[in-house]
């Protein structure tokens, strides 16, 4: 008999088949903005958004490199290929160095990174043979690529942009001009360096036994090695040249809108390129153009310009490493925005909205240029986004400065600001009034009404109702506060609103279940200072995290630590916050406040009511439901987290995957808790993997359970093998018996009971050893 799978069951099977094992990490670096590339035989290495990918020019295979599968670090600043050792030298912004060989093996050199120096900024890397000359903010560091060791450090005291060995003389282009020293002399002695000229030089290269240099703002010159005279070859005009390099028989000089090919002192040709090129690599008759918007494009000469001959290379990835806000839609898609609350009017992140589809593992980056063209205004600092619960594919996104943007099927359709809606600008008049329509948050309620926080104005709360009409709510306590940010309608029907900084704190309104009528509300606000149950008061400067857990308790994350409201009625009366006390268990009987003094930026609640706490500079914590137990503490030292500065957290409650947004990009961790079901149903209970094959070493997951579900695993004879309690809707079994031994091949039954001991349901697992 052929059975048809329901779409819901098919979705479950797809999710299970692609589900990572508990404890697995995934990173999501952006590979979008291509800035540099290197040719290595039939392979093209591309530096994009601080990440690395390669393209095989023979079989068209693309490989993505990250700090889980290959690399030792993140945030690459420079790459350079050495033909002598057949390896790519990778330099990171923190001065860490990887050597990636053609056979995909890798060697890390962290000596320079670990040195204590006033500055370790690396400006460039020039490779000649098996020597890498690293130009730094203080001079030149020489790396022997054969022996994988630093052979010399020349502390010239000048900010050095480029280094080149020519006729036994080492040339450096610095902020103070060009210097050189003979390799026969002791170059550790600054007196053995001579100043050639005072022109700030960006790059050197050699052609036909002559030395050429690129002088900032001026152009490309030949530098006579004997008399130090400069001869102009090509003058900088329009977009300035980025660099110069030898492609074999020619010098190549790329700029944003052109590339010049120099064959001799008197022979050169300039070709137009696509606007926005950050680097162009010549390989035979082919050019590879790196572009901020379109990735890497293969081009060839077509009359007086370079023309693309293939579709751009741009791996599917986030458009940027911005992820200040993250939220899951009802159908399991992750929405990400990259804006910041530009309170001081000095940070302008490009308008960034991204969607990650877990079922296809694909990213979609919302359009940007069309918005700027349509509105005639900047498109920056997108702080939040939400999907209409009554119309999938209908989105609203907020900007801290330019109002609200409406999208349908990911296409921009309308901007709302002070001119066409009740939204208000912080400034009532002036030339830049349109820049100050500050909307940190938009969020739909269950009825399809869009709640908008309009900070810094009189009527902070604006509601775009489902019927298209607008409603403004006034609370005098919130008028003109500079960073009112997030609304929360709790399980009691109370409205809470946070103020982040400037005047940080909490506002609460008992709405009497009349949300759109404020006249019958009881209201209170707590600003700048919090007092705990022991009478200790804290000055609060930032309040970024506020969330209700599954028990109705409210968790507040501030710059000075973690606070709890476990009885909202009492809190409304006395304004006393609770700080959890964690016993020291050292015989003193003393306890410490949980996470006291820790700067908290984000909090999320998982399916087992556990708390994921993101900090400003100390990574992310997982706490037990009551906060008394620290289950995990992940940092860049013990995990692939891109940074210890955690901006946002979003949890896929179906899979248990925790997405973590940092100031340097995103990662996810597969946890052991999912959202619980309301009741046990054998059709919803699944084991993964199933069957369990001999080469599998991870945990076996049983999903589709109720909260605090009792799970027993027995063999075919009915003997108890393992038992425990589910975390949310999931139970994890390590495939071992009570003695810690791996169970043998066979069929094992999973017996499940709810927290009252009722409704026993069975599924089974096949294990093959």
Q: For the regions a protein language model found, what residue spans apply to each?
A:
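Glycine-centered coil/turn sites that cap beta-strands in beta-rich domains
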Residues: 679-712, 730-733
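Carboxylate-rich, polar loop motifs that coordinate divalent cations or form catalytic acidic clusters
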Residues: 4, 20-685, 720, 751
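Hydrophobic h-region of N-terminal signal peptides that target proteins for export
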Residues: 12-19
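Bacterial N-terminal signal peptides that target proteins for export
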Residues: 1-9
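Short, surface-exposed loop/turn motifs with a glycine/proline- and acidic-biased composition
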Residues: 67, 726-757
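Interdomain boundary/hinge segments at the C-termini of tandem beta-sandwich modules
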Residues: 767-769
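Short, glycine-anchored, charge-dense loop/turn motifs used at functional sites
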Residues: 710-721, 748
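Edge beta-strands of extracellular beta-sandwich domains
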Residues: 760-765
């Amino acid at each position: 008999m052929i059975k048809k799978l329901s779409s819901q069951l098919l979705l479950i099977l797809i999710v299970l088949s692609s589900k990572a094992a508990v404890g697995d990490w995934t990173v999501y670096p952006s590979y979008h903005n291509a800035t540099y590339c290197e040719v290595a035989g039939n392979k093209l290495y591309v530096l994009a958004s601080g990440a690395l990918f390669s393209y095989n020019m023979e079989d068209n295979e693309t490989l993505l490199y990250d700090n889980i599968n290959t690399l030792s670090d993140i945030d690459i600043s420079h790459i350079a290929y050495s033909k002598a050792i057949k390896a790519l030298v990778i330099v990171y912004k923190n001065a860490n160095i990887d050597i990636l060989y053609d056979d995909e093996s890798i060697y890390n050199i962290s000596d320079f990174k670990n040195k204590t120096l006033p500055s370790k900024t690396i400006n460039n890397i020039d490779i000649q043979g098996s020597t890498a000359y690293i130009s730094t903010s203080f001079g030149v560091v020489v790396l022997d690529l054969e022996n994988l060791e630093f052979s010399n450090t020349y502390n010239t005291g000048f900010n050095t942009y480029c280094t080149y060995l020519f006729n036994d003389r080492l040339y450096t282009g610095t902020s103070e001009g060009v210097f050189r020293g003979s390799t026969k002399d002791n170059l550790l002695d600054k007196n053995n360096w001579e100043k050639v000229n005072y022109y700030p030089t960006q790059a050197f290269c050699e052609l036909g036994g002559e030395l050429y240099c690129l002088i900032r703002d001026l152009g490309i010159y030949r530098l006579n090695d004997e008399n130090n005279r400069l001869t102009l070859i090509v003058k900088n005009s329009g977009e300035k040249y980025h660099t110069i390099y030898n492609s074999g028989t020619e010098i190549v000089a790329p700029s944003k809108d052109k590339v010049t090919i120099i064959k001799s002192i008197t022979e050169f040709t300039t070709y137009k390129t696509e606007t926005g090129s950050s680097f162009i690599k010549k390989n035979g008759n082919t050019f590879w153009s790196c572009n901020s918007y379109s990735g890497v494009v293969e081009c060839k000469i077509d009359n007086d310009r370079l023309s693309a001959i293939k579709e751009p290379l741009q791996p599917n990835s986030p458009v940027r490493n911005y992820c200040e806000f993250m939220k899951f839609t009802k159908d399991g898609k992750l929405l990400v925005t990259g804006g910041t609350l530009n309170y001081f009017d000095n940070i302008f992140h490009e308008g960034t909205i991204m969607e990650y589809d877990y079922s296809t593992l694909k990213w979609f980056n919302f359009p940007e240029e069309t918005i700027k063209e349509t509105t005639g205004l900047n498109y920056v600092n997108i702080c939040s986004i939400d999907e209409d619960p009554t119309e999938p594919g209908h989105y609203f996104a907020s900007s801290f400065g330019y109002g609200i943007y409406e999208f349908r099927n990911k296409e921009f359709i309308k901007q709302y600001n002070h001119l066409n809606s009740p939204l208000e600008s912080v400034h009532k008049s002036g030339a830049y009034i349109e820049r100050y329509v500050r909307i940190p948050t938009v969020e739909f309620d269950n009825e399809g009404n869009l709640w908008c926080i309009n900070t810094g104005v009189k009527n902070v709360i604006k509601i775009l109702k489902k019927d298209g009409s607008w409603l403004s709510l006034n609370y005098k306590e919130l008028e003109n506060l500079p960073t009112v940010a997030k609304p929360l309608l709790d399980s009691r029907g109370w409205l809470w609103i946070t103020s982040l900084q400037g005047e940080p704190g909490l506002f609460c309104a008992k709405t009497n279940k009349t949300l759109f009528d404020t006249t019958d509300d009881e209201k209170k606000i707590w600003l700048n200072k919090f007092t705990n149950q022991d009478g200790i008061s804290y000055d609060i400067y930032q309040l970024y995290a506020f969330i209700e857990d599954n028990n109705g308790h409210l968790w507040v994350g501030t710059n000075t630590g973690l606070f709890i409201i476990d009885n909202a009625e009492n809190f409304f009366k006395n304004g006393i916050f609770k700080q959890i006390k964690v016993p020291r268990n050292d015989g003193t009987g003393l306890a410490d406040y949980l996470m006291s003094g820790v700067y908290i930026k984000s909090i999320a609640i998982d399916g087992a009511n556990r708390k994921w706490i993101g900090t400003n500079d100390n990574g992310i914590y997982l706490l037990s439901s009551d906060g008394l137990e620290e289950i995990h503490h992940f940092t860049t030292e013990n995990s692939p987290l891109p940074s210890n500065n955690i901006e946002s957290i979003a949890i896929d409650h179906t899979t248990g995957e925790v997405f973590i947004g940092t100031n340097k990009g995103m990662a996810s961790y597969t946890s052991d808790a999912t959202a619980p079901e309301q009741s046990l149903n054998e059709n919803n209970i699944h084991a993964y993997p199933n069957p369990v094959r001999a080469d599998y070493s991870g945990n076996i997951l049983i999903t589709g359970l109720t909260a605090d579900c009792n799970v027993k695993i027995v063999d075919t004879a009915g003997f108890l093998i393992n038992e425990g309690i589910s975390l949310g809707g999931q139970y994890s079994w390590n495939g071992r018996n009570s003695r810690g031994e791996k169970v043998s091949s066979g069929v094992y039954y999973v017996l499940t009971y709810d927290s009252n001991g009722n409704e026993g349901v069975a599924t089974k697992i096949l294990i093959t050893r």
